[in-house]
Amino acid sequence: MSEKEDIHVEETAKNMTNGGNAAFHNYINDFAHIEDPLERRRLALQKIDEASFGWYHVRAIMVAGVGFFTDSYDIFAINLGVAMMTYVFWKEGQIPSSTETLLKVSTSVGTVIGQFGFGILADVLGRKKIYGLELIVMISACIMQCVIGSSPAVNFAALLTFFRIVMGIGIGGDYPLSSIITSEFSTTKWRGAIMSAVFANQAFGQVAAGIVALVLVEGYKDDLKAAKSGSTCGPSCKKALDQMWRILIGMGCVPGCIALYFRLTIPESPRYSLDMELKAAEGVTDATKFVPGLNGQDDIERLQSNPTAVVATTQEHPYGESSGASESPVRVDVPTEHTPPKASFKDFCHHFGQWKYGKILFGTAFTWFCLDVAVYGLNLNTAVILNAIGYSGKGSVYQKLHDTAVGNLILICGGSLPGYWFTVFTVDIIGRKPIQLFGFFILTVMFCLIGFDYYNLSGKDLLGLYIICEFFQNFGPNTTTFLIPGEVFPTRYRSTAHGISAGCGKIGAIIAQTALGTLINHGCKKNNKPQNCWLNHVMEIFALFMLLGFLTALLIPETKRMTLEEVSEKYHDEVDPSKYRSSHVQNSTNSDTSSSTVEQV
């Protein structure tokens, strides 16, 4: 092997990165033999952006979607699990309302921490180093919840709350990571559908939790039927319920264990990895630009099959005259300041401190905040809706748990599940912004109807409005608030900005549960009114938040069928580095020429 070939092999090995599996292909290594980092970046990203939808993308959806499956499974399971564990750990099967709220809010508190923390870390340390750690946190916390108990030295509720906060941190970390990784590995044409399908795993998680709960209730039916109430739940009944809630919550970590290998072996995102490589090579004094429209898919195939191939191009003269075929890329002097600045807190504040950029972050964060406030509003009506369809949860312990599981399954399949998948099939056709705006508009109208006409609505009327709200919540802002932040920000801040947006959403959910949720009984006892007497006014407040979400969504740009680099260039004024080529890289047909020479067309 000649010295030149030895050098080429060494350079190729130096450019290769670790990782890669059946779900996330290592695109960087496909072009490791390309010496120019800018050209290597261009070819790798072009292959990702122009790829046809295939089983590779389906596997990526499954691996990235596991976190959201676990998230929704856990939230649904804890609602059913609390109903089970109340008979075991609290007298008469009555859990204090403050304790119940604490258990349910604790996950959201942890989620906020995870969203902010992991979002920043993924931009600082890289996607590969972080992805999988949040799933390990989720799995570990899930297992710990299943084995805790009560003793004179340990408060059961406090310990369970602690592990739910820990689990929330893992769940929160999955939001920015799964979003941006899916976004950066997806083909441009179907990126919205792929990201929406990842998020739609939430619906499958809810359905799975309902099915597991129903199977457990039927499996322990003989132990539960004899108990007509919490006071008559004997030792065998309590033992059955204690086993049931532990199995129900513990089953949530099974999908995560299966997907953990794929997350830990993921390659670094080509966009992040190659951008960091460019930052390290910023000592290059000038760059040369490729003629737009050249070096297409055929070039990728030729370069992969023959590392030493030189791509012939037909150049267009600046004045329209054809200059014929050329064996070298066309190069034009370009100032180095086109390279995006290095990520830092100072640059982050400077960039988003400008309204034309900051309004996008404000838009994604505040729309998510408004949405999550109102999502809790739908949950306030669940008991009324279940009663309307005959699943009020009255009667024996068995009947209560059975009705709760079946009733919630009906509501999920009636509204949430179709809504998610309508978004998957239409988001790359209709666009993100129209779906988000229309969803907020419909939710505003529906909440107004429920709020201002609440006492004139029958149970069936509420059921219809509830299903419409569930449908347009998911065929609307619930999906798009997750999707848009994963696309609309530049690579160096994509994870951080997504984490901030998602964190603001969960803060909205916490406020709704702790503050607005208590308003439903405002003045009820004092004025001798029935329970939930102020629910109609609370729904009116939620309608206002939906209107604010609609108005704020106008600040967010459309990203349909645009590459991530085109989005950054259009909305953040950042020139795509892939358009340039370092002048220090010698052309294969003129290797003896000085590396600092730049030819201008």
Give the predicted meaning of each segment.
Residues 2-601:
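Transmembrane-helix signature of 12-pass secondary carriers
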